[in-house]
């Protein structure tokens, strides 16, 4: 008898042995201490390069560069003021501020005057005139106090105490703008301040720490007062340009700044202005000062909106170094290698600060006083719990998990 066929056994193809694949994979792994470590090292280097490219991205470099443009404008302001006060004995800080406010008035206030609707100058004045009046006074007196301090205290004290604006901006941004910082931001801030301390140390070593110093306590208090007012003005500026517009801020600053500086000029500085030996050189210096000041005021809101008030004030720490580098050729200052160390230390701190975005724990109930009536208004339910939103403020999306925000 013929045995029955077994089709199932014939139809099943031989399955490949799984252990062969596993064995092959294990055999291909580089052994410890062998030449395979080179590939691991190459992958590590590639990972480091990728992280560096992520940190030094285009947006971050643009932000740092914009801050340095502001520093160069402040350098121009300082140089023209130095020539006016030391070479031509024209000590007119209020008049110089008055010229800047007049330019802002002519450009931005007139722009508001010709607008229609809720963005018109009269409509803005009806709703917010007293707030801009206070802001104009703060901005004017911040400039005046710091310039006045040079008559009483030393350059070293002014450079150190002027850094007080940074903690003022951080605290005001935290409580009023609800900006939240990460550890890397505080590390960057500390590095920037260390760079500033290095510059002051270099000034002491080369003998630039001397100053008038007639009444050092009064001068130091003037610097602290001016730095505090600067911080308030910068945070208020960021608040307005993020909720309203840059043109409105500059137009109202020009209006009230010109008004109050004109009054202060007539009361306190008219005699000094009459003593100025007017000629084409002095006129050119006033034009240069006004151009740099107008450029600073016009460009700073753009940089603040792209970054933040804190980032801008950190960037401005290099302004003294630019003035010093120019002074090496113009005023024959002594050079120290610590100046270069200070410059690059501040830049490293800026890179660290800008490498990670800050974020805003934004409660929709916060921005009420400067709300733009022409913009869309969203009615929030009164019975439901208002939940905050988390918005990154500077340099793009973060890959890490968004921090948890709680509203009390």
Curated annotation (Swiss-Prot):
Tagged with keyword Transport: yes
One GO CC term on file: synaptic vesicle membrane
Source species, domain of life: Eukaryota
Membrane topology classification: Multi-pass membrane protein
Molecular-function annotations in GO: transmembrane transporter activity
Subcellular locations according to the entry: Cytoplasmic vesicle, Secretory vesicle, Synaptic vesicle membrane
Keywords from the named record: Cytoplasmic vesicle, Membrane, Synapse, Transmembrane, Transmembrane helix, Transport
Role noted for this protein: Putative solute transporter.
Family, per entry: Belongs to the SLC35F solute transporter family.
Record-given protein name: Solute carrier family 35 member F1
């Amino acid at each position: 008898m013929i045995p029955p066929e077994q089709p199932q056994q014939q139809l099943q193809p031989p399955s490949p042995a799984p252990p062969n694949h596993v064995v092959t994979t294990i055999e291909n792994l580089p052994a410890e201490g062998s030449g395979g470590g080179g590939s691991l090292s190459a992958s590590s280097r590639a990972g480091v390069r990728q992280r560096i490219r992520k940190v030094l991205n285009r947006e971050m470099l643009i932000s740092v560069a914009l801050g340095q443009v502001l520093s160069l404008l402040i350098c121009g302001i300082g140089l023209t003021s130095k020539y006016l006060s030391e070479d031509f004995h024209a000590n007119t800080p209020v008049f110089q501020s008055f010229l800047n406010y007049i330019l802002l008035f002519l450009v931005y206030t007139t722009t508001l005057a010709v607008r229609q609707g809720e963005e018109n100058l009269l409509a803005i004045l009806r709703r917010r005139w007293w707030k801009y009046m206070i802001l104009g006074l703060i901005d004017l007196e911040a400039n005046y106090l710091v310039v006045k301090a040079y008559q009483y205290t030393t350059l070293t004290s002014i450079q150190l105490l002027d850094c007080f604006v940074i903690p003022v901006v951080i605290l005001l941004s935290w409580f009023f703008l609800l900006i939240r910082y990460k550890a890397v931001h505080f590390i960057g801030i500390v590095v920037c301040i260390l760079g500033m301390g290095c510059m002051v140390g270099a000034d002491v070593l080369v003998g630039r720490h001397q100053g008038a110093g007639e009444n050092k306590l009064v001068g130091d208090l003037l610097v602290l007062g001016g730095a505090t007012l600067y911080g308030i003005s910068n945070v208020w500026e960021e608040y307005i340009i993020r909720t309203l517009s840059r043109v409105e801020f500059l137009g109202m600053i020009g209006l009230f700044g010109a008004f109050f500086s004109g009054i202060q000029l007539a009361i306190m500085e008219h005699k000094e202005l009459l003593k100025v030996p007017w000629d084409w050189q002095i006129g050119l210096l006033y034009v240069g000062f006004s151009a740099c000041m107008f450029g600073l005021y016009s460009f700073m809101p753009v940089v603040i909106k792209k970054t933040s008030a804190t980032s801008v004030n950190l960037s401005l720490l290099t302004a003294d170094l630019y003035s010093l580098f120019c002074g090496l050729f113009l005023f024959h200052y002594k050079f120290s290698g610590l100046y270069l160390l200070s410059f690059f230390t501040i830049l490293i701190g800026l890179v660290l600060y800008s490498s990670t975005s800050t974020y805003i724990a934004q409660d929709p109930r916060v921005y009420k006083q400067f709300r733009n009536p022409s913009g869309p208004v969203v009615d929030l339910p009164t019975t439901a719990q208002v939940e905050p939103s988390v918005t990154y403020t500077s340099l793009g999306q973060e890959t890490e998990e968004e921090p948890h925000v709680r509203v009390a």
